[in-house]
Amino acid sequence: LCFIRAQDAGGAYIKTYLKNENIFVYDEKYIHTWPVHPYDALIELIQKRNWEKLNIGVEMDSHYFTAYCYEKLKQGLPNAKIKDSERLVNWARFVKSDTEIGYMKKAAKISEGAMKVAMETIEPGLRQCDAVAEIQKALFKGTPEVGGEYASITTLLPTGKGTSASHLTATDEKFVNGEATIVELSGVVKRYHCPMARTVQLGKPEQKKIDAMKATNEALQAGIEATKPGNTANDVAQKFWGVLDKYNIKKESRTGYSIGIGYPPDWGEHTLNIYKGDMTVLQPNVCFHMIAVMQFGEWGVEASESVRAVSYTHLTLPTILPV
């Protein structure tokens, strides 16, 4: 069933496989007229179908299931047993079909093309926003085979001291010779994402950045080589952090998360984490974004790959690139 605002119902009729009788609409009187709320209409629907005494699963940690939604359900359905479904749909998406893998491969090609544009475009004196304009053009233009879509996260572009922070976006400031820039982006095909990140160095890089980037790539490669069905997320993490330990590099944040379908504000699936102690077993066609964010006070480097669990892995990682 699809429960949707009347103004947006056309999207459900056009974009889904649902029969019309399974699309339930509510009108404008429920929109932003507190205390009236769309869930008042949802409660009426549940009562009409005699579901008000059943177990009702809700996604307690969903981006769009608010505290007010929850309170409405509790008040309107006092005899129902409302339970956290604990990311039920997310876990159902965890293992991809071959068709889904096909979409992600197409998204990967778009990511590669857009990153190439980023590498060719970023230069001293250019505004960050102008570079992102070219990157976004490439992401939407896609490939001759398939066009792109908007990503769940906009292109990220921390620059200079900003490389020591995460998830910064472009400004109208200009790129500076001698500084590094991190580019994180994703191609999208039928809402399937395949993100990647690279570090661009303008001018001659400092030795500490070269060393950090080499260690980052080595750690990523070690983790990727451990990405095989039957291994756990912890196995991948142990290989990754084993390399960092060798170079005495400290990293507290996770280094990967499952990916697939995504809508704003996130392209992660909120299931698997590549982190020590996550014992989730990798199955064939499990996909995750393995992202190595290395931050060292006032500077940082980063590289990432989208990885698929198969019986073999082979991937050549980049190095920090002078432009």
Language model segments and positions:
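Active-site neighborhoods and metal-handling regions in enzymes and metal-associated proteins
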Residues: 1-317
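Conserved AMP-binding A3 loop
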Residues: 320
